[in-house]
Amino acid sequence: MHARQGMTRRGFLRGAACGIAAGLMPWGTARAETAPTRLALTHGNGRAANVYDALKLIEPQVREGLARKKTVVIKPNMVSVNQQLAATHAECIEGILEFLSPLVKDDILIAESPANGPAHEGYDNYDYRRLAKPYRVRFVDLDAEPFQTEYLVNERHHVRPVRFSSLVLDPDVYLISAAVMKTHDRAVVTLGLKNIAAGALLKDGGFRWGAGSRGKTDKHLIHGGPENQGIHYNMFMLARRAPPHLTVLDGFEGMEHNGPTEGTPVDHRVAVAGTDWLAVDRVGAELMGFDYRKIGYLSFAADAGLGETDLDRIEVLGERIADHVRAYRPHDTIERQYLWM
């Protein structure tokens, strides 16, 4: 019974993704006419410096994107408000702000909806508040902001309404995903896209993990069922709705084994940045030693032409990928996570 359900789920997910891909992807010679995708990879002994240097390498692409938007929003990853290894470090945000300072004249919003508690606790615990002195920033709790209704699937492929941040979906926003390179217990890895797709799903203001919590959260609905039957399809669909315009992966200290909250540190000292979210996440997975084709949502997005995944067509500025690949230990449930294939 379990195997038959798995086959049905795989058929549904692959069929749906390929059907969408047929409508999105300009298959054929049009692909060959595009210029290679550029992204940056840096390595060094300073987290903020790594991020800043990576962004400087792709400054023309970032400037081009900023010129078309009114507001800049940095979305950190705070799956936990009280565990630094699981969250975007303030020094990563500092590197981004230092780069943006001469390019953006208005306040830059730092906006988050942590999984296990209120945003203000994360901002306090991780010392984000100090960034308000040298930079023009404003801190936003996405759970207190307007939302729009999006739809995800559950394990029976029925749609479920969810609250999704209106700020993240705002067409006038230049959205930056500032993520940590981590393994994951359901989606293999956490990188730039997952930070947006899961992080912009909202919860009630009083919600916390654990017994006695007040309110509800919509974040778990991205899993698509108790065995994560729809997680990759849901991530893929949200990638079409809210792709980041700029992705920054902070791998100065990554997380391996039982991420995204119970893993152990990896002294990697890298940063990746680019305006093609799929190319950045694909390179991030490569640096962590994972085959992106085994990561469902990245595979679906590649089939749909949502970005570049061919390393021969990705121009990496700065360091060479091959020089910095580390074999991150995967989550204990990794084989079960690969059952979508």
Model regions: which residues?
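N-terminal and secondary-structure boundary signal
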Residues: 2-341
